[in-house]
Amino acid sequence: MSHQTGIRANEQLAKVLGKAKNGKLRVVKVSIENEQLSCSATADVKKDWERDYDKLLGPLLEETVPCYILYRLDAKIPLGHSWLLISWIPDTASIRQKMVYASTKATLKTEFGSAYITEELHATTLEETTLEGYRKHKRDFAAPAPLTTREEELKELRKTEVHTEISTNTRHQTLGGISCPLTDATVAAVQDLVRGNYDYLQFRIDLEEERIHVSHAAQVELSALPKQVPEDHARYHLFLFRHTHEGDYQESYVFVYSMPGYTCSVRERMMYSSCKAPFLEQLAALGVDVVKKLEIDNGNELTEAYLLDELHPKKILHRPAFAKPKGPPNRGAKRLTRPSNEDQV
């Protein structure tokens, strides 16, 4: 199945989306009906966004029926108000529904205007669609606050203490390489990926503190994947590749290690190379079953054909028979041998 479903907004939805940008609508519910994006319901602004959230959102969601929700926040951006896009795809939805809604979300963002959508939430349970669920999502993904000068001094002091404390935040050497600790934000992002909030994560190694940070988390179309790969720095990438193979729908985690040649420092190349295997073990411990590990030096390599070929190599159905080599030329006539007297006895 292609990554673009061909589904587009109908005329009614196009008018509603245009009206929504004037700031009077709080909620727009969008459903896929008859192979079209259509407006199922709207709600006007009543109070502030937090007090409107559960009151307006709850009645619009059906327990087993997926939909999109465009929710207007009160924060302002240069274009107008910022919007939250909620993808409500319950676990009970069919595989086809999950595929169609996942593949059509980018189209909805384009129809509405991606610049207006400043936040996204992927929900599979009704609890995740509540205001508290949204706040928890924000807390889980919030990056840790930078250390104060005093905290930095205490950190350095602990490094010089006589006893050594080994924990998940301690870098250590393993047989497979160097295990760098993950930041809290990195762990939260991976957990969100497993829950379905994202399908793409990018990681960087802070060479000074030797920790792995999440540098980007999003829902990314495969066609836009090559643009995520930096041309001047190494990175790790984790992508949920949704595809069909021999008629079966599959979701496969693909891990990509990108290293743009010798534009990176020697230390950067060594760190990314040494940390890769332990990092994959950490991902496995967090519930990520990586099906394929790839190494590239250019983002343009990440095409659908390339990933399919790596995940499902083409089988050779016909093997030509091994041809018996010919003997050397000019061997002369075949010699006849006379039987000996012993053979005649």
Curated annotation (Swiss-Prot):
Residues 4-139, 177-312 form the ADF-H domain. Its main location: cytoplasm. Signal peptide: none annotated. GO terms for biological process: actin filament depolymerization; barbed-end actin filament capping; positive regulation of neuron projection development; regulation of actin filament polymerization; regulation of lamellipodium assembly. The keyword Cytoplasm applies. It is found in: Cytoplasm, Cytoskeleton; Cytoplasm, Cell cortex. Keywords: Actin-binding, Cytoplasm, Cytoskeleton, Repeat. Residues 320-345 are annotated as: Disordered. GO terms for cellular component: actin filament; cell cortex; cytoplasm; myofibril; plasma membrane. Interacts with G-actin; ADP-actin form. This is Twinfilin. It comes from Drosophila pseudoobscura pseudoobscura (Fruit fly). The lineage of its organism: Eukaryota, Metazoa, Ecdysozoa, Arthropoda, Hexapoda.
